[in-house]
Amino acid sequence: KPVTFFLHTPWPKLVPNDVIAIKILEFLATGMLAADVIEFQTQNDLQAFEEFALTHLTTQTTAGKLKVNPVSVEVQSLQNQMLNHEHSLELTESDISYVHVARTDPIKNTLVAIASFANVVRNSEPSQVRSYLDVYLVPSRQQWPSYQGLLTEIAECVNKYNDILSSLNYSPIRIHIGNDYHRASQALIRYDYLIACSVADGLNLVVKEGAILNNRNGVIISTESVGAMAELGKFCVVAADPTQVCVTQALLDANALDFESRRKMSAELKRHVQEFDSSNWAQNVVANFKVLEKV
């Protein structure tokens, strides 16, 4: 008998009110319940799926195994990048680097990331130290007008806040458009603050890549809506909500951390991602085969 899997599975944490959306979820859940193994990204995803199935599919049961096994990154490959990296980011050693890496997707909350950074810089004491936000965007779903409009809106937002901050005599927000993985990786090595403030995000591997690549005790600022925070939230600054007010406050909290706190958080991030890397994820997947062979 073939073994069937669902891997790296997200599930909505809130059940929509829309009847059609519920029907679609019922259709998906019915197929999933026929699988031998369903692996979810987080415990919250698993619990949300169980609650949905119990409520909406009361006559259907599953003999399959439900478990949490979040996908991860290939640590050795990332560490090799660190050995071969080149500094080409137009930053001096004293510059403070904020980084946001995302697809052009509304859920990534890029507009809030930009506005929150601008709030922090605008309300900071005058300083000789420059702060930059480098926004790395991979255009996504550009065949859809709403996504085309978002990219335009982000560019306009960058120009607006650079104008507001013109008294700094430099442009603190820089936008980089294109799928340039090498340059984005350089930014992850160099950041002081990595902003991943998604409204909803199944996992977000950028924060795991950043945790391994970074060499400056950089702080990750995120939200509870980012799936990776189920694993890493204890070692990050997590905004109460993905709103501009809350993300701004999270940035201020991150700025207030002392050197030792930053060092410990960075070390714990690296330790956790190294322990639960992509090979650990794959071993957990393969272990399912061994169990099912005995059934």
Per-region residue spans from a language model:
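Conserved catalytic-core segment of nucleotide-activated headgroup transferases in glycan assembly
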Residues: 67-180
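Histidine-centered beta-alpha loop that forms part of the nucleotide-sugar donor binding/catalytic region
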Residues: 7-10, 70-71, 225
